[in-house]
Each structure stands twice: as C-alpha cells, then as structure tokens.
Amino acid sequence: MYLTVCQQLKHLSKDEFLILRELCRTAKNLTNQAIYQVRQHYFEHSQYLPYEKNYAILKTSENYRLLNSNMAQQILKEVDGSFKSFFGLLKLAKQGKYPFSSCRLPKYLPKDGYATLIVGFVRLNGNRFVLPYSAAYKKHHKPVTITIPPVLADKTIKEIRIIPKADARFFEIQYTYQVEAAQRNLNPTHALAIDFGIDNLMTAVSNRGESFLIDGKRLKSINQWFNKRNACLQSVKDKQHYGKKTTRRQAVLQRKRNNQVRDYMGKAAKQVVTYCIRNDIG
C-alpha cells in the first residue's frame, strides 16, 4: 500500500524559492495548454482527445521543454485523468444514470496562479533529492536540493509533489512511499460507534459498553483565535483598500491555523485507530 508524508519546505535560498515559483508557474501554463487542446477538440469534434495525441501536440511547446520530461508528462496525465472523469460522467448521463447539469468540463487554472510539480520517477543521492530539470533549464539555473526526512530513509519513494500554497508564498512537499500492508486479524463482531461534536470532538462507544471522549475545546479555541485575528487584519486591509487578495500576514495566520488543525485531527484519528487495535475491534 502507499502512504504519504507531508512537510513544509523550509530553508530555501532566495534563488531556490524563485526557481520553484517559476517552475510552478510553467506547470500552470502547461496545464492550461493541455486543457485547451482537449476542450477545443471536444467542441469541434465532440470527441475525447487522448493523452497520446495531446502529448504529440504539446511536446514541442515552450512550456513543455522548460520542464523535465517526466514532470511535464505527469501534468498531461493529470489533465487526462480529469477529462476521463468528465467523459465517464457524460456517458452515465446519456444512460440516464447521472444528471447532465452536473457534468462540467475541467476549467482553466487562474492566469496568475501556480500548479503542483509532480515527480513520478524519483532518484535520490543518499538522503538528498535534486529537483530534475530539462536540459534547456539546467543551463541557466542552479539545482534545488531537498533533504529527505529521516523517517523515509529506508522507504521506497514512488512520487514527490511540490505544492504551492498561498499564492506560492510557501511550498509543501509530499512524499508518497510504498510499504507492505499489515495484516491484522481483528474481531469483525466488535464495533465502535463515533459521534462528532464541538466541545467533545468525538464520543466513541463500543458494542461491549466501553466508551471514551476526545476533547474538541482545543480545536474550538484554535478557530476562535484565528477568527479574531483574521477579523482584525481584514479590518485594516479594508481601510487600506487592499482588494480581495490575501495579505502576507493573513497567509501566515491561515497556515498556522491549518497546521494546528491538521495536527490535532491526525492525532485524534491515530488515537481512535490505536484504541480499535488494542481492543480487537474489526
């Protein structure tokens, strides 16, 4: 099975940061190019443009040649997957199994936006990962080197994603690695019912009469603090006629809140899983 480790990319130099922004912008441009080709083919011929034909059209484009070939192909495959889902829903709609009104073509990414960099073929140099470049890009840019977290030292990494966050003010990196699934012979007659709430995030009761609570007040206070600080920053922004864009301070605040919520929810889920394993709940 596959698991994922997600981290925030830190300790980037100014040049490395700008390179990642530039590559993510190029990835967005290639994504929109790929979407355009499939959409236009559908409008003109009422047919699906497969990945192979889209690749043949775009492999000589400027955006494709600026990216490493593996990364560029991953982008085209992502677009291909989106359109396969659309045409799959369209087929169901023609059979009367899905409403036509819910079938929507994949949309373009924002013109000033960024897209995720996907590395599907990972090569490591010890505990370091060097972001792959195209031959043309490598001539004029220094390499971006990322240290792999120690927890992945003995793992087989299958894919790496670099995700721009908050208008590419910072980046997250996701490592997808392969492990053998643990086979547990738990009792299928033992069950656990979970009720989600606010002050009590989870109220869990087993069919053997045992129960436990997971506190939700900490999560509630995190959101209350965020709303209070964000309202203050929004008030200042409105007085300065800053517009609808998120400010740097708001982006930092949102990132902190999201990290705290993600950490708390992950630990709560881990506690439930551990309880089920210890009590033979299958």
Give the role of each language-model region:
Residues M1-G282:
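Nucleic-acid substrate recognition interfaces
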